[in-house]
């Protein structure tokens, strides 16, 4: 089977994915212990960003690894209806067509959203396929499909029956542009420059005034108290008195509360319970009235004096300040830096707003969810995220689950004309249960928070409330892979809901990864113009197309110039096509536990070269083994060389390191171990060491067979070991190498084993670890490297065969020389190797050391004397520093007394070694000086 000369990912990736999907390789096998991962459902109409690609690579690596270990593997896929995000996209589309949702009406608007979902809902799933995600597409779910909608209604009704869902007036984050409550996650706190106004509030009895400070003067019209600290001596006598609230002309009490910081400002705080979260809590503690002064558009309503009604909040602020100033009640204005809450989608300032909403009472649900992590039923990786989880869970507010949107799960509650509320799975059930006959009913207009349905994700996708085979087999799931930013919004709620409805944890482990940032460590965002599209890494993109992508549809068009300039600087030639495998390997190499990762184009470039390296290694192996006797499935005699035994031994260590790292979610360590073994040991050394055996006349047929067998079997194991990281290139090569290594026939027979995906992941065999071979191979490599270094430093042409002398060697060195003379001569390009006894004198030479043994390259006619003096001087300087460091360490009583004896002894041995090497190099330097 001929392999293409060069590796071209675009020629193999998509066809392999289609092949795997059509063959059903992503489905659970039905054999082995179950292993299940639930994909965090991306927005149905969204597209894949670097964070998704990073997360999906981690999940796919785990899934492919466990599948190869024989587990009954399910990676459950699905998408989220993403209420607010999807509704906004469709509303923008309608605005472009000159209409809006209110003109269309609810039903027609929802038809439009479903239409939009059908049109663009496939983007993210197509992109997931491009990433190589081996999810079971036959089980794909959507948070608003019939089954999941049924589960949502079931959960709502059951929680309501138990009194755990209720309707009440509470303060929420209100988006005045979108006219809905939004979650904390959808609020961005932006640092902005503003003012702090200091006003005088007159005492009702006319005896003086208090000074209060605020950044939001317009809200003073809703004040219902002024608070001071109970221990503040300045105001002790005032507690219980009242203030005449200016402009509103009503009396409000002066109250004492620990919330007040007596050292901030005047130590007096205006309390507006209906428009500030902290004030709301103070208001509840003191039973204060809650006066909502805003409309849903954030204009002032009829609760304020007539002159302010209908003004928007910005106009109202100016009028309030002017009016108080005119009354002589404005004391001063300071510049002030403030954190302004803005809606992450609308960009407008969010209002704390008092409104009727549906809530989940979380206290009872939180207790078992805390216990599950405390007792180890659920473990966070890294463990420090458990503390973040606990701090949230122990300070939970009831969860506002209603949203004033049209797209989403409509709340299953109906109202009669008297305002009575009836909750049920559908209207029919409500009428029957409450004997309502044909009483007119209207359903609640609100929909549920998107996080409500996604909190049921692990069990609803497997068929709950029915008791299905899938639920019994795959629940609880094994691991959740998620970003830290949604531990509270999603992870905690999944744990609460799943424990409540299944008596099981949703997953046994939570692997928390960091954010993917740009090369400067900045968060990627459209407004910064630093977003990278994973598909552009795979397929490549021109500079012009990249600039166009980054500047199109900017919220702040003034940033276009700056973004263009930056893109020109970072990607002067656009982005090369690197292929999926190089992208995945880059993500994994950067995935150190829990930390944010800085994207590095140098890395992906390097890993594209790594793909080429593997490809070229496979071509070399194929050329030298195909059609030859590889000693597999035959009785022919096979003899292994030192290099063969060494690489087999090194493979066992690499397999163990990769498996242990994957088992502990250290994807960076696993990918590094695979890379080091494949590039440095197999490609750079073993392939070179195989050439003398395969191409030389000094070796027997049995030895040639041994090397051919080792070449193919180790390469085949490498492909299986690297497959979870790099699925496409490994499958392509395995189809050609597998049969040579005695594995399954190439694809096309329709057998389950016709793919590397279902081959066993290589397991380390301790019996194959050969320390003698490892010692010998390291010696051979060290001698070859030493000669090559001298060649490079002395500028000796590569083609020139050299004589070398070995001096001061031990018997073990002599034995290794005798056994490996051919390797050394061929790979170091030597014309002769002379062993010198202690009595023999050596010619003036360039010197390198392997242990205590000196490698001498005679200099006559070869060497640049000045360059060699400089080289040796540098080596000597380096060794002197090491001697000084070791001496300092051994003179330090803290080290000598406290370190284990073995560590101290090791340091002493190192010092002796450094001194011995130093003496030899100094002697050599003197020789050269007198040449």
UniProtKB/Swiss-Prot annotation:
It is found in: Cytoplasm. One of its GO terms (cellular component) is cytosol. The keyword Cell membrane does not apply. One of its GO terms (molecular function) is ATP binding. Its main location: cytoplasm. It holds the Pfam family Anticodon_1. It is an enzyme of class 6 (ligase). ATP binds at residue 526. GO terms for biological process: valyl-tRNA aminoacylation. It catalyses: tRNA(Val) + L-valine + ATP = L-valyl-tRNA(Val) + AMP + diphosphate. Residues 859-931 form a coiled coil. Its EC number is 6.1.1.9. Monomer. Catalyzes the attachment of valine to tRNA(Val). As ValRS can inadvertently accommodate and process structurally similar amino acids such as threonine, to avoid such errors, it has a 'posttransfer' editing activity that hydrolyzes mischarged Thr-tRNA(Val) in a tRNA-dependent manner. ValRS has two distinct active sites: one for aminoacylation and one for editing. The misactivated threonine is translocated from the active site to the editing site. This is Valine--tRNA ligase.
